[in-house]
Amino acid sequence: MSRHHKTVLNMAKFIQGQSLLLLEKLNELDLDAEADMCERLHEDAERLHAGLLAKLNQE
């Protein structure tokens, strides 16, 4: 796996982690609508990371 591939994976993993932290904070503040949006964002980030990992490991 190239350096660029690792960078892309690290960025996707970072977004996944940050979206989870944001979700926790939004829940603490009882911002339900925003927490719902953030939960979808986190789920998308998980799928993105998993998809990138699978694709880049094939190459």
Where do the model's predicted regions map?
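Short, charge-rich amphipathic interface segments used for partner binding and complex assembly
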Residues: 3, 11-59
